[in-house]
UniProtKB/Swiss-Prot annotation:
Family, per entry: Belongs to the enolase family.
The name this protein goes by in its record: Enolase
PANTHER family listed in its UniProt record: ENOLASE
Origin species: Brucella canis (strain ATCC 23365 / NCTC 10854 / RM-666)
Function: Catalyzes the reversible conversion of 2-phosphoglycerate (2-PG) into phosphoenolpyruvate (PEP). It is essential for the degradation of carbohydrates via glycolysis.
UniProt keywords, alphabetically: Cytoplasm, Glycolysis, Lyase, Magnesium, Metal-binding, Secreted
Domain of life assignment: Bacteria
Keyword Transit peptide: no
Amino acid sequence: MTAIIDIVGREILDSRGNPTVEVDVVLEDGSFGRAAVPSGASTGAHEAVELRDGGSRYLGKGVEKAVEVVNGKIFDAIAGMDAESQLLIDQTLIDLDGSANKGNLGANAILGVSLAVAKAAAQASGLPLYRYVGGTNAHVLPVPMMNIINGGAHADNPIDFQEFMILPVGATSIREAVRYGSEVFHTLKKRLKDAGHNTNVGDEGGFAPNLKNAQAALDFIMESIEKAGFKPGEDIALGLDCAATEFFKDGNYVYEGERKTRDPKAQAKYLAKLASDYPIVTIEDGMAEDDWEGWKYLTDLIGNKCQLVGDDLFVTNSARLRDGIRLGVANSILVKVNQIGSLSETLDAVETAHKAGYTAVMSHRSGETEDSTIADLAVATNCGQIKTGSLARSDRTAKYNQLIRIEEELGKQARYAGRSALKLL
């Protein structure tokens, strides 16, 4: 009854107007699953590879080749298989690809099918996706990391860090956390406007004001938290995504906006000072993806009091994560389904992290769609944290809205992670 009888891939648009892959899976009993694949702007060198067309169409970014793979090779390989055999289906696709980085079939083709299969199987089981994937213990609503000021690769301003985030750790529910974030977001917008800055939003819905450095951005956020009636550090904590790989050149961290260069030790000490001066509880990619020595120094320096998240460092890859655990590097992993390219491998990365005492943060990409799968996966894995952009753009708010629905559906079983999500608080 849950055998796969049809798979349809198509080319749709993501939130940046670039093509991406969407996949429909139909089962023998009529159950249906649909998934759309996200795409990143700042990508790690060790990520699974998307299949893009090249040429002039869509400026080379078309995905007709990936769609052809979905409708051809992948359908031929898994047609008739039981959709409830997720691990077997994912492994079949990984083996069919045969490469280390999914470069033959394309991670965008494989992931679209993997997620759509899970959704179809969930529908066949009569269960919401978070319950189907996570089982009876899936009940923790994640603390959102809300990206409200953008810099780096996500903005055209002098700020070298990519994201400045707020975390409503003092809220009592996801519904209340979203309200906290919205009120700070709109307060920040007014304060930026009053100070003469533009308030256009970037790829992830955050503002991209022309501020001179990270401290200026943090000061604006601190003032906005207080003006909105909240206590920084108590109601709302702060987070950074440095995306340090983007400005790591010849062994140093080159801050073009500030016209400063810091060696790895100076970079770590700079981050430590920021975490001391502001209620910063999480720092993502504070060091470059292959600067293992710098990562180790940073972890030894502040890893006992600040969550240090590996994104480009780990790329949702369990093997790289195990290397980090062995070396004592970072203490958290950012989880992006398209970095690794299948649902099974994503779940394995979260499990590997949790077994080692590392936290996990479910995450979107800067190129998103209205697909809200990651909201369900955040609850399914009980990871307790989600990063899905600001309080603007429907491709971001779709995930918050889905979390609100899940919380309502869970009723008294629902628990908002709050401060407990960050083990060091």
